[in-house]
UniProtKB/Swiss-Prot annotation:
Entries under HAMAP family matching the protein: GTPase_Der (MF_00195)
Single GO MF descriptor: ribosome binding
Protein name: GTPase Der
Keyword match Cytoplasm: no
Residue numbers binding GTP 2: 186-193, 233-237, 298-301
Entry coiled-coil feature ranges: none
Disulphide connectivity of cysteines: none
Highest taxon of the lineage: Bacteria
Lineage of producing organism: Bacteria, Pseudomonadati, Pseudomonadota, Betaproteobacteria, Burkholderiales
Protein function: GTPase that plays an essential role in the late steps of ribosome biogenesis.
Entry binding sites for GTP 1: 9-16, 56-60, 119-122
Gene name as annotated: der
Native species: Methylibium petroleiphilum (strain ATCC BAA-1232 / LMG 22953 / PM1)
Family, per entry: Belongs to the TRAFAC class TrmE-Era-EngA-EngB-Septin-like GTPase superfamily. EngA (Der) GTPase family.
CDD domains according to UniProt: EngA1 (cd01894), EngA2 (cd01895)
Domain EngA-type G stretches: 3-167, 180-353
Length: 446
């Protein structure tokens, strides 16, 4: 699982700027699940080969008792609870404040590793400016500048030093001994645990009729028709007889971690509620992660034909970016429609890991060009010459030629459709990369 770093601090100390720096994004919202995260934003970061999740929070006032500040404090406490490391951000230029002391007092009781990031430290005499921050009792302040990128690598190195990162898997992607890691993802109460319980034939995961009653991701070994699986319930496990209250029961972090750790994601939708913003955000993250995906609409038996038609349109419109994914209709509680789900999952993984021969790719490419040439860009028309596979899971197809920087997105989608049709690829995203010759006259037309 990817480690989780939570950014905590009072308002206007530069947390969002640091978030953008760590995630190499100006967007500050990589996975903002509407209605669930409010003032918590989630993004992916990387230091070399080490990947992690960053949680950005709103300004933290631990003693707030009402209004928006109380809600923001609640959100921040939840971010701390689901994190592995807390990065406590302070403002060097403003010095230590009473709010900083309040936050430090809270963090000392949180039981988490805490790093003190002294932000806005560019161009300052660090020893003099940082000395006062020792009084917070958070250890040595680490001087950083979110705006200028100074000290970021040292901060991340300290944050990640205690984590063992997974070594590359020695088993080939198509090795029959390799289990397919399947993440069952979706909003609270769409039936994730019920579906897995039905598959396993036992209450291995405790399912209650209440949104979000499971908590931490759990992996369950499973075998069907000779194929090994590892099922991941992204909401997680709540053990029988152990009752606890969570500030917010649906854990976005666990969902993101499970998706990142999976080979195939089964995205579960609720037929009685249609496609929501939360569904679309989760689907978008799955696509960005490059994971194979199957859509399953649960509680299909609970809606009439008119509602089914509306739902189909909603899926086509709101999840158009997942049009490559098969859509299946099921009832987990009644065990209806579950058989085809397994075939779709196996097909999606087979498609994601399929080996595509260069001669066949090139033939399909040239046939597509003969059927429909790319549009001219001024005096030049892009010349597509040959293609080869650049990667698996998801499939990457690299196309070589001249003036390929002028190939439109629409034409790339056309080519993707031709490749998908020929190789019968279902349930996996596909990436097409264009590589032009440096000299447009280096290769003569054949």
């Amino acid at each position: 699982m990817k480690p989780v770093l939570a950014l905590v601090g009072r308002p206007n100390v530069g947390k969002s700027t640091l978030f953008n720096r760590l995630t190499k994004s100006r967007d500050a919202i990589v996975a903002d699940f509407a209605g669930l995260t409010r003032d918590r934003h989630y993004g992916d970061g990387r230091l070399g080969e080490r990947e992690f999740i960053v949680v950005d929070t709103g300004g933290f006032e631990p003693t707030a008792e009402s209004g928006i500040y109380k809600e923001m404090a609640k959100q921040t406490r939840q971010a701390v609870a689901e994190s592995d490391v807390v990065i406590f951000v302070v403002d060097v230029r403003a010095g230590v404040t009473g709010q900083d002391h309040d936050i430090a007092r809270y963090l000392r009781t949180a039981g988490k590793k805490v790093l003190l990031a002294a932000n806005k430290a560019e161009g300052m005499l660090e020893g003099i400016q940082l000395a006062e921050f020792y009084e917070l009792g958070m250890g040595e302040p680490l001087a950083v500048s979110s705006a200028h990128g100074q000290g970021i690598r040292s901060l991340l190195t300290a944050a990640l030093e205690d984590f063992a990162f997974d070594e590359p898997d020695d088993l080939a992607l198509d090795d029959p001994e390799r289990p397919i890691r399947l993440a069952v993802a979706g909003r609270p109460n769409v039936g994730k645990s019920t579906l897995i319980n039905t598959w396993l034939g036992e209450e291995r995961l405790v399912a209650f009729d209440l949104p979000g009653t499971t908590r931490d991701a759990i992996s369950v070994p499973f075998e069907r028709n000779g194929q090994k699986f590892e099922l991941i319930d992204t909401a997680g496990l709540r053990r029988k007889g152990k009752v606890f209250e969570s500030i917010e029961k649906f854990s976005v972090v666990k969902t993101l971690q499970a998706i990142a750790d999976a080979n195939v994601v089964l995205l579960l939708l609720d037929a009685t509620q249609g496609v929501t913003d939360q569904d679309a955000h989760i689907a978008g993250y799955i696509l960005d992660s490059g994971r194979a995906v199957v859509l399953a609409v649960n509680k299909w038996d609970a809606v009439d034909s008119y509602q089914r038609e509306l739902l189909q349109r909603s899926i086509e419109q709101r999840l158009a970016f997942l049009k490559f994914a098969p859509v299946l209709h099921i009832s987990a509680i009644k065990r209806q429609g579950l058989g085809p789900v397994w075939k779709a999952i196996a097909d999606a993984w087979a498609s994601a890991t399929k080996k595509l021969a260069t001669p066949v790719l090139t033939r399909v490419l040239l046939e597509a060009v003969q059927f429909q040439q790319p549009k001219r860009a001024g005096a030049f028309r892009p010349k597509l010459r040959y293609a080869h596979q650049g990667g698996q899971n998801p499939p990457v197809i690299v196309i070589h030629g001249n003036s390929l920087e002028h190939v439109t997105d629409a034409y790339k989608r056309f080519l993707e459709g031709r490749f998908r049709c020929h190789f019968q690829l279902s349930g996996t995203p596909m990436r097409i990369e264009m590589k032009s010759s440096r000299n447009p006259f280096a290769e003569k037309d054949s």
